[in-house]
Amino acid sequence: MNLHEYQGKQLFAEYGLPVSKGYAVDTPEAAAEACDKIGGTEWVVKAQVHAGGRGKAGGVKLVRSKEDAAAFAQQWLGKRLVTYQTDANGQPVTKILVESCTDIAKELYLGAVVDRSSRRIVFMASTEGGVDIEKIAHDTPEKILKATIDPLVGAQPFQGRDLAFQLGLEGKQVTQFAKIFTGLAKLFQDHDLALLEVNPLVIKADGDLHCLDAKINIDANAMYRQPKLKGFHDPSQDDPREAHAAKFELNYVALEGNIGCMVNGAGLAMGTMDIVNLHGGKPANFLDVGGGATKERVTEAFKIILSDTNVAAVLVNIFGGIVRCDMIAEGIIGAVKEVGVKIPVVVRLEGNNAELGAKVLAESGLNIIAATSLTDAAQQVVKAAEGK
């Protein structure tokens, strides 16, 4: 689960980390009032969405009057912000963060992820702050410094000092960086995070370090341990199809192709997408109906897939285990009839009672193409999507 910047900074403040004074507002009037509360003559206003690249898209602005802050809020609240990290529809803006302006001397990067290979939390730091860290990692990997956290003892101040020296920090900055480093590590572990970024971590004109941004992603599998953070969830940022799918325990991720995919099992779903790509097609989604491919779940899956107007054909790839293929076939037929599917549907059944399932499909009288293998299914659905 992603957090907004203002929510991340709330957590930072709880751990004693240096953040700007600011307020998250949802009206132009509140934006103007926030400027008065903060004081000063310059403020930064930021549209709050779960995506990076806001500055280049016009979602971050320096303002010098509370009227300009209100105008910015009026411009963005209720609108959708499109960045290089969103789809063409963008993300809705329901909050604006109004902050005090920070005089920046230098930008750094500090982040942490769970590294699967080492099975540890790994911190990354770089002198190249304020830019896309993935680009730095690709172009100049030597500029990324790393520190691995031992889960038995946690982050140690000496690790923070070591990173600080390598970043070229000096004097009080070394102590400040070590405090930020250990604070972020404790926050990461306490709240079961999957990713944390401060980009940029800045050196202010007075030489002090300051967390100018906050990006946090919480491990969805650990949310049951984080009841406090459940209240931070912003449903407006969810893809409506993904949110609807979750209600029926369907794992759905929207993509940008035109071939809908319905599969039971995450591994088989990924393999199905790969083979569709291999044969020249582009999947419109990842959809795992799980082990219980019942008529009800298949029906909802079809509804979700067909809500994407780009979908030109659907590939159903089911491996029958405990649930027999003939029962799955009957569920598919019932779902196709109920939903009123008008586009071609290619079905590949394998496993328990696969032959009987294929027979049931063939005798249905519906526009359902029974595939003989996974390769055949991919070839058939690509042709169908192309109108051949």
From Swiss-Prot:
This chain belongs to the protein called Succinate--CoA ligase [ADP-forming] subunit beta
Q: What Pfam family does this protein match (any one)?
A: Ligase_CoA
Query: Could you describe the subunit structure of this protein?
Result: Heterotetramer of two alpha and two beta subunits.
Any one GO MF term held by the record is: magnesium ion binding
Q: Look at the named UniProt entry and state the broad enzyme category this protein falls under.
A: ligase
Q: Where does substrate bind?
A: 264, 321-323
Q: Name one GO biological process term.
A: tricarboxylic acid cycle
Where does this protein act, in terms of pathway?
Answer: Carbohydrate metabolism; tricarboxylic acid cycle; succinate from succinyl-CoA (ligase route): step 1/1
